[in-house]
Regions:
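Non-catalytic, mostly N-terminal accessory regions of nucleic-acid modification and defense proteins
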Residues: 1-167
């Protein structure tokens, strides 16, 4: 998620810089209206530059907290909870101090070469696609009961193509 929002944010920043001929104030205002705001220390690339730090777990936790704060309306729950607060990249579950840094560095190294900006992806809805993937796997792993409520996108598309809708027609799921 962090790599995706960082790449999209950087791409938008480059677009606005070109559009507004380097006027930083206009670029800043335009970026504030984007889907997500990515503070500098929350950027994937900031973390990547610091990937060998013995405090990389704490840095990732801080980056996610700052990202939540900058996007409170989108990433905060209605009850005031935040989606990343229960994730701890500094947890002893990741191993001893050296092992933890190694694992997190490897994770950052694996994501670094991927370009996840909108112009490089087949679909702009990466988050929706990931969510649909998780729901589909939950439905198939949970048996028929959970699967009763999930219709794969391919089935929906096929049904839409097979039905010849007429003006005023309605389709119900």
């Amino acid at each position: 998620f962090l790599k995706y929002v960082t790449d999209v944010y950087i791409e938008k920043k480059e677009e606005y810089t070109k559009k507004y001929e380097g006027n930083e104030e206009r670029v800043k205002r335009a970026l504030e209206r984007e889907r997500f705001i990515v503070p500098e220390e929350s950027s994937f690339y900031f973390l990547y530059e610091n990937r060998s730090s013995p405090k990389i777990g704490e840095m990732i936790n801080h980056a996610l907290a700052e990202l939540e704060e900058a996007n409170r309306e989108k990433l905060g729950g209605h009850d005031g909870s935040n989606i990343f607060r229960n994730i701890d990249f500094n947890s002893s579950n990741l191993g001893d101090a050296k092992g933890k840094v190694t694992r997190l560095r490897t994770l950052l190294n694996d994501f670094y070469p991927l370009i996840l900006s909108s112009s490089h992806l087949e679909s702009n809805d990466v988050i929706g696609g990931a969510y649909e993937f998780l729901i589909a796997n939950f439905a198939s792993d949970s048996g028929k009961k959970a699967g009763e409520f999930f219709t794969p996108a391919e089935v929906s598309t096929l049904l839409a193509k097979l039905t010849k809708s007429k003006s005023g027609s309605r389709i119900y799921d």
